[in-house]
Design a protein with these regions (language model features):
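Charged, compositionally biased N-terminal leader segments and the immediate start
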Residues: 1-22
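Two-metal-ion RNase H-like nuclease active-site motif
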Residues: 180-182, 320-324, 395
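Charged catalytic cores and adjacent phosphate/nucleic-acid-binding surfaces used
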Residues: 189-326, 335-346, 358-388, 400-560
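Accessory alpha-helical DNA-binding modules that contact the DNA backbone or grooves
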Residues: 14, 26-196, 200-227, 236, ...
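Short acidic/polar active-site loop segments enriched in Thr and Asp
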Residues: 113, 178, 348-349, 446
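Active-site catalytic microenvironments in core metabolic enzymes, especially phosphate/sugar-handling
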Residues: 393-396, 523
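Hydrophobic residues within beta-strands of alpha/beta enzymes
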Residues: 180, 351-353, 448, 480
Length: 560
């Protein structure tokens, strides 16, 4: 066993000992030993126990640990500490700037147990509320996590958007193709992006490579009619050069996905595609133009053949924003600041405020006394700013048994309720499904929040039987949230059509914790389009009068 492996193991042991509040002297002794072993000019594994004990700065106790590690390839003490520590907490120890003391606060005070949750908390500005954390530390942690994500070669759509659009503009300005389009996963608005692909109507000539080299991209590779390179952030880019007469089919081909292309090709039956546009090619196949977001294979062709392709929702269709937080719980801006931003900047008609409920102690959840005070503030605001309206909501935790964490009397005081799971996420499918369905069957539940609890590229959601959950929402007239945070985008777009077919409304909710968070509704709209959502099936595309009636009807049923 190499010295570096032994040192790394001792370092982890010292970190876990400190995390679990063991004797500071022993912690320091193990940490010092890790440093010492790493600097030794000879392999310590070749030494006897007695020889290790004689090494300056180690001693009998440390020598015993090293001997045990070399002989058994493990440490009983380390295994015991690891069994008491969530794997995600151990993973956090690799993040620069996070020592055991800070990790302990993150774990015990904020209730965060993995890197995905930590990244989400950074986006919500939750870390700056904790002891020993400031804005600078939070940003450094966020950047480190983003760097680690990038090293895996996969990105959230929101992470690559500004780069992709800037690259498109630069190509138009400096390479000057006749036409250029972003294609691939980006054009299909996929939630995860592996590469940025473009189609350029231009010959790949000797003038292009020097320009790309001057842009400081890495690993530039010239192929036949294609140039590949990597951005500074690690994003793979592919430029595909075509002539104008082939551009329609090439645009379809490079947009994909492959299943969509294969089905379309079989429908074309060898038709002449020369000088045809995208729309003309779909017409040759006997179907209407299919929007790029829908091109994932099978579902879109069934809709096209039955002339049932939806008029996809647009961001401008949204009339209000539901599921948002303020300084009453873990938000950054006050209730008034959030509402005025919606009213004056976004020109929306209403805001749904849904601060965390009392079980969410880690997020400054509201007890009954604070709830009453918040509702008084909402009443005062609504009097001053009519016709704009704040709806009184709450993000009520779905407890482990599926119940909500307030009495019926308190629940009846809200205009609407978003019910979400935030704790005990380690469930099998049966348990998770039953837990959600019990909450859905609660007459006070209006919207089911982020149904699987997933954090893209960071944390898998708990497994659920989507059909059973959606069917329960249909039976109980519960709306399902499309959580618009780019890390969530949950309900997954693959289930939107099933929900729509069952008559379930979907709601594009930003889960905003500060004013800038409302911008996430745009990402929610993109993923809703991918799922085939039209404004008629979207709750917050309703105007103020329509949604007020819906909430009132729900409240009347609660009283039956």
């Amino acid at each position: 066993m190499e010295n570096k492996t032994i040192a790394r193991t001792l370092r982890l042991l010292s970190q876990l000992m400190e995390l679990h509040d063991e004797n500071p002297f022993k912690v320091r002794s193990v940490a010092n030993a890790a440093f010492k072993v790493d600097k030794l000019p000879y392999p310590i594994a070749s030494k006897t126990l007695d020889e290790i004990e004689q090494i300056d700065g180690l001693g009998k106790s440390i020598a015993g640990k090293i001997s045990e590690l070399v002989q058994s390839n493990t440490l009983a003490e380390l295994k015991d500490l690891l069994s008491q520590t969530p794997p995600g907490i151990v993973e956090m120890m690799r993040i620069k700037g996070l020592g055991p003391k800070k990790i302990l606060i993150i774990w015990k005070d904020l209730g965060i147990e993995n890197v995905g949750e930590l990244y989400y908390a950074c986006n919500e500005n939750r870390l700056i509320e904790a002891k020993g954390f400031g804005l600078k530390t939070q940003e450094e942690i966020k950047k480190t996590i983003e760097f680690n994500m990038a090293s895996n070669g996969r990105f959230l759509y929101a992470q690559v958007e500004s780069f992709a659009e800037a690259l498109l503009d630069r190509i138009k300005t400096e390479i000057k193709p006749e036409y250029v389009w972003l294609t691939g996963q980006y054009r299909r608005k996929s939630e995860i992006i592996d590469s940025i692909d473009l189609v350029l109507v231009k010959e790949l000539d000797h003038t292009i490579l020097p320009k790309l080299e001057s842009w400081d991209y890495k690993d530039i590779e010239v192929l036949e009619n294609q140039i590949k390179f990597q951005s500074e952030q690690g994003i793979i880019v592919q430029l595909n050069f075509v002539n104008n007469n082939e551009s329609g089919w090439e645009l379809i081909l490079k947009t994909g996905n492959q299943e969509h292309v294969d089905i379309l090709q079989s429908m074309l039956k060898g038709a002449d595609l020369y000088a045809k546009t995208e729309s003309e090619i779909y017409k040759l196949a006997g179907i209407p133009f299919i929007e790029p977001e829908l091109r994932e294979g099978d579902m879109e062709f069934k809709l096209a053949k039955s002339n049932s392709l939806p008029q996809l929702i647009q961001y401008s269709d949204l009339r209000g924003s539901l599921h948002n937080h303020s300084t009453w719980s873990d938000g950054i801006h006050t209730l008034e600041e959030m509402a005025l931003f919606c009213k004056n900047e976004l020109k929306l008609e209403y805001l749904g405020i849904c601060d965390h409920s009392k079980s969410a102690f880690y997020a400054n959840g509201l007890n009954e006394t604070r709830l009453a005070a918040q509702q008084l503030e909402i009443d005062e605001f609504n009097k001053k700013h009519s016709p704009f309206r704040i709806f009184k909501g709450i993000e009520s935790d779905i407890l482990y048994d599926g119940s909500l964490d307030y009495s019926d009397k308190v629940l009846s005081s809200f205009d609407f309720i978003v019910a979400s799971v935030h704790s005990v996420l380690n469930m099998n499918e049966d348990k998770a499904t039953a837990r959600l369905i019990k909450a859905i069957e609660n007459p006070y539940t209006t919207i089911l929040g982020h149904p699987t609890g997933r954090l893209l590229l960071s944390r898998n959601g708990y497994p659920i039987d989507h059909k059973k959950v959606i069917d329960a929402c249909a039976a109980n007239q519960v709306i399902i949230e499309i959580n618009a945070n780019p890390l969530r985008l949950d309900l997954d777009w693959r289930w939107h059509q099933y929900a729509i077919s069952k008559g379930v409304l979907l709601s594009i909710n930003p889960d905003a914790h500060r004013k800038e968070g409302f911008n996430d509704m745009r990402y929610g709209t993109l993923i809703a389009r991918k799922g085939g959502l039209s404004k008629e099936n979207c709750l917050n595309a309703m105007n103020l009068e329509q949604i007020s009636v819906l909430f009132e009807q729900k409240k009347k049923k609660q009283q039956l």
